[in-house]
Design a protein with these regions (language model features):
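Glycoside hydrolase catalytic-domain context in secreted enzymes
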Residues: 1-463
Length: 466
C-alpha cells in the first residue's frame, strides 16, 4: 500500500515519467528514508533496531517504488538504523539509493537532522561534513552545512560540495528557475522519455487559469468522496438504522452533540495544514444543526444543558479522539516536534508522541457521564491520526464510527452516514490495541497476540485491512 501511494503521489505531482516537470508540476521529495516508523517506543526520531530482512521486506519497497516512479527527491530520516544515522549512512544514501536503485535526484536531510549528528561527529562542522560525505545534498535549518568552509582544503568535501551543487542546479534548471542561458553542467532527460529538457530556460510553465479552476473543482469532489470512504463502522451495525431513524424523526426529541471535537473542524485536517477561510469551517455539530435546526444541542463537556434535555434526547453523538492541530507560529525542537503543546493541543503528528494511548482528556469518563444522564442511543465518532485504546468507547456506545483524518469534508461525511444517506465502506488503516500495555500490535505480526497475555485474552480490538 505504501508503495502504491508513493507511485501515485509522484505521478500526480510530477506527471508520468516526469512529464509535468517544468510544465506546472511540482517536484516530490519522498520521506522519510528510512524506517522512521519503526522507532523504539514509537518516539519520533529514535533508533530503529531492525534486521536486514525486515528493512528490505517492509521499509524499503516504497523507496524502490518511488525511484521507479521518478521521484526527484528523498528526505533522509532523523532516526538511525542499527546505530547508523540515516543522514550519515553512505550505504543508504549512496550505495543503495543511487548505486543499486539508480536514483538521480537530490537527497535532503530533515529539519536540524544534520546538527543532531554532533554527538557522533564531535562538532557542528564535523556533523555537516559527515552528512555531506554520506550523500546529503541539502540540509534544512542546520548550521553544519553553513560551516563547511572549515574544510576548504579537504578534497573529499570540495568534491562532494560540487557534486551536490550540480544536482541542485540541475533540478532548478528542470523547472526553469535559472537565469536565461545559464548552464548547470548538463541536461536532464526525463525517465522513459526521449525529449530533452532544456537547461536554463529562465521561465516556468504555469497552468492556465481555467485549468486551475477545473483542478480545484476536481480536488474538492475527490476530497468529498475520500472523506466518505474513510468511514469505518467498528461496532453497532445492528443499531445503525434505528439511530438514523431517530435522527431523522422531527418528533423524536433533541439531538445532543458532545465531546471535545463536537464543534471542531481542525481535528479532521491532520498535520501541517493550511488555514481555511471562515466560510469553509464547519463541524459535526454545525452540520447536524443545518439539517435539523434547533433540535440539535451542544454540550462539549457534557454540561450546560438541563436534565430534561438529556432525558428527552432522541440520540447523543459524541465526537471523540485526538488532533494534530498546532499553531502556525510554533517553534520546533531538533526532532521536528512542536516545542510547546497546549493542554488541549496536538495529541498526534510529527514529534507529538504519547506514552499513554488511551483517549486523552478523560473522554472515557465523559461517556460515563452521558450514560448517567440519558438512555438515548449513543454514537461515538472517533477522529484520530493514531491508534487509541477504544475498549471503553465500544463497551459504552451503541455504535462506534472511526473516521481518521478525513479532511475538510469529514464533518459532512459523518453526518451523511449518521442519517443513512451514505454507507461506511472504510477499513482500518491500523490495528487497534485493546489495552495500552499491548502495543505494539501490527496487522502483519508473524505470531498472533491472542491468548499470549495472562491478563488480556484478546489484546486487539480490530485489525488493519490492507
Amino acid at each position: 500500500m505504501a508503495s502504491r501511494m508513493c507511485e501515485a503521489i509522484v505521478a500526480g505531482m510530477q506527471g508520468e515519467n516526469r512529464s509535468r516537470v517544468g510544465r506546472g508540476g511540482v517536484a516530490v521529495v519522498l520521506k522519510h528514508l528510512a524506517a522512521q516508523g519503526e522507532a523504539v517506543g514509537g518516539r519520533n526520531g529514535q533508533s530503529a533496531i531492525i534486521g536486514t530482512h525486515d528493512l528490505h521486506e517492509i521499509h524499503l519497497p516504497p523507496v524502490v517504488a518511488g525511484v521507479r516512479a521518478g521521484a526527484l527527491g528523498f528526505m533522509a530520516a532523523y532516526n538511525d538504523i542499527d546505530s547508523v544515522p540515516c543522514c550519515a549512512s553512505p550505504w543508504l544514501l549512496q550505495e543503495y539509493l543511487r548505486g543499486e536503485l539508480g536514483f538521480d535526484g537530490i537527497v535532503m536531510a530533515d529539519g536540524l537532522a544534520v546538527d543532531r549528528l554532533v554527538g557522533m561527529a564531535g562538532s557542528i562542522p564535523a556533523s555537516g561534513r559527515a552528512a555531506l560525505l554520506a550523500g546529503v545534498d541539502v540540509s534544512l535549518w542546520d548550521e553544519g552545512f553553513a560551516s563547511l568552509e572549515r574544510y576548504a582544503d579537504d578534497e573529499a568535501v570540495v568534491a562532494a560540495v560540487d557534486r551536490s551543487l550540480r544536482r541542485v542546479l540541475e533540478l532548478k534548471a528542470m523547472f526553469g528557475l535559472l537565469p536565461e542561458g545559464y548552464n548547470a553542467g548538463c541536461d536532464r532527460v526525463p525517465l522513459g522519455s526521449n525529449e530533452r529538457i532544456g537547461v536554463g530556460r529562465g521561465s516556468i510553465a504555469l497552468p492556465k487559469a481555467e485549468a486551475i479552476t477545473e483542478a480545484i473543482a476536481h480536488t474538492r469532489e475527490e476530497s468529498c468522496t475520500l472523506a466518505g470512504e474513510c468511514l469505518t463502522l467498528l461496532d453497532g451495525a445492528e443499531q445503525w438504522s434505528r439511530i438514523g431513524a431517530c435522527l431523522r424523526d422531527d418528533q423524536a426529541g433533541s439531538i445532543i452533540v458532545t465531546g471535545p471535537f463536537a464543534d471542531d473542524m481542525a481535528c479532521f485536517l491532520g498535520d501541517y495544514t493550511a488555514p481555511l477561510e471562515q466560510t469553509q469551517i464547519t463541524s459535526v455539530y454545525r452540520q447536524l444543526r443545518e439539517r435539523f435546526g434547533e433540535r440539535v444541542l451542544l454540550a462539549v463537556d457534557g454540561t450546560g444543558l438541563d436534565g430534561a434535555d438529556w432525558l428527552n434526547a432522541a440520540a447523543v453523538v459524541a465526537v471523540l479522539g485526538g488532533t494534530s492541530e498546532r499553531s502556525y507560529d510554533s517553534a520546533f525542537a531538533d526532532n521536528g516536534a512542536a516545542a510547546a503543546v497546549a493542554e488541549h493541543g496536538a495529541t498526534c503528528g510529527e514529534g507529538v508522541d504519547l506514552c499513554d494511548v488511551t483517549l486523552p482528556w478523560r473522554q472515557d469518563a465523559l461517556l460515563d457521564r452521558v450514560r448517567e444522564l440519558t438512555d438515548a442511543p449513543l454514537v461515538s465518532v472517533v477522529v484520530s491520526g493514531r491508534a487509541h485504546v477504544l475498549t471503553h468507547v465500544l463497551e459504552t456506545s451503541d455504535a462506534t464510527l472511526w473516521e481518521g483524518y478525513a479532511g475538510q469534508y469529514g464533518p459532512q461525511a459523518v453526518v451523511d452516514a449518521l442519517v443513512g444517506e451514505t454507507g461506511m465502506p472504510g477499513r482500518l488503516p491500523v490495528t487497534l490495541p485493546a489495552y495500552a500495555g499491548a502495543v505494539p500490535v501490527r496487522y502483519n505480526d508473524r505470531q498472533s497476540a491472542e491468548h499470549v497475555y495472562r491478563d488480556a485474552e484478546e489484546p486487539e480490538i480490530g485489525r488493519a485491512h490492507v
